[in-house]
């Protein structure tokens, strides 16, 4: 994969000292980015935190001197530094903190022209929740950057795509057990695995009952043979019936691309308008 990327002229980011040790000839006299673990992990769930000792990503700062020396010995230049703290972060100050951590190691890499601060810009998932403040992040980064002559890169990812998509599914059955009211829909974790995988919250709306009083508390589940096939827990919705159309919001990112045919269930069809 490294060879194919280099042959295609792809800008290569290395996040493991082992690769440089194992294949020095491959990286000889190259211009490279390094992905660093700045030990500043944040995220909406522990499974999406991508920095710190519990994350597999990035070169630990304790190995950075060895990496720099090895690259110098094979005539390679580090022209960019990259880090990604995690996903679903609403606090703009996280990126300022990350930039300041970059600046602590920057004197050791005089050829660096780019600082890539990664992605993870959060998307509001509940009604009334404040969104990510891009203007504040801009102010914080410019203030921290000062007169430093480098490019700042960001990878907005889900921030751009999440709100552009929804999941639609019909109610197939209803069931009550004690105080729990189950609302079954025609698809589940095979189409949207985020709730089951890391407890992601998605707003759910009964499009067939718009304007009706939301006086029923439902657990919304799919048809997959897993107790974890839950789309939403404890949601107040109008009393629903078989055939009602349910909308699950913010599925434009990490929805269809993470779907599967698990349990031989076809995932929801994707329509692009």
Model-derived regions, located:
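Active-site-proximal beta-alpha core segment in soluble small-molecule metabolic enzymes
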Residues: 1-114, 123
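General structural feature for long, well-ordered alpha-helical segments within catalytic domains
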Residues: 1, 19-22, 60-63, 67, ...
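Short, glycine/charged-enriched secondary-structure capping and boundary segments
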Residues: 26-29, 47-50, 95-96, 130-132, ...
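Charged (often Lys/Glu-rich) extended helix/loop segments that serve as interaction or gating elements
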Residues: 140, 149-273
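Glycine-rich beta-alpha junction loops
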Residues: 36-40, 85-89, 119-123, 158-160, ...
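Short glycine-/acidic-enriched loop or helix-start segments at secondary-structure transitions
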Residues: 23-24, 43-44, 126-127, 163-164, ...
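Conserved beta-strand positions
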Residues: 14, 83, 117-119, 154-156, ...
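Acidic, glycine-rich loop-and-beta core segments that form the ion-binding/anion-interacting portion
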Residues: 96-156
């Amino acid at each position: 994969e490294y060879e194919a990327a280099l042959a295609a002229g792809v800008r290569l980011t290395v996040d493991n000292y082992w690769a440089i040790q194992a294949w020095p000839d491959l990286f000889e006299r190259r211009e490279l980015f390094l992905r660093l673990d700045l030990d500043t992990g944040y995220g909406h769930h522990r499974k999406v935190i991508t920095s710190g000792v519990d994350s597999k990503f990035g070169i630990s700062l304790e190995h950075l001197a060895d990496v720099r020396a090895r690259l110098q010995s094979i005539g390679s230049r580090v022209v960019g530094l990259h880090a990604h703290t995690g996903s679903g972060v609403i606090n703009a100050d996280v990126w300022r903190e990350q930039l300041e951590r970059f600046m602590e190691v920057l004197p050791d890499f005089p050829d660096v022209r780019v600082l890539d601060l990664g992605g993870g810009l959060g998307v509001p998932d509940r009604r009334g929740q404040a969104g990510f403040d891009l203007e504040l992040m801009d102010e914080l980064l410019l203030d921290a950057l000062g007169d430093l002559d480098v490019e700042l890169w960001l990878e907005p990812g889900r921030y751009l795509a999440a709100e552009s998509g929804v999941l639609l599914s019909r109610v197939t059955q209803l069931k009550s057990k004690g105080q729990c009211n189950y609302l079954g829909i025609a698809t589940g974790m095979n189409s949207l695995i985020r709730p089951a995988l890391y407890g992601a919250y998605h707003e759910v709306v009964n499009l067939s009952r718009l304007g009706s009083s939301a006086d029923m508390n439902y657990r919304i589940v799919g048809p997959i043979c897993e107790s974890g096939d839950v789309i939403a827990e404890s949601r107040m919705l109008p009393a629903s019936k078989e055939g009602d159309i349910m909308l699950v919001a913010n599925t434009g990112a990490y929805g269809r691309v993470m779907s599967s045919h698990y349990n031989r269930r076809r995932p929801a069809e994707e329509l692009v308008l």
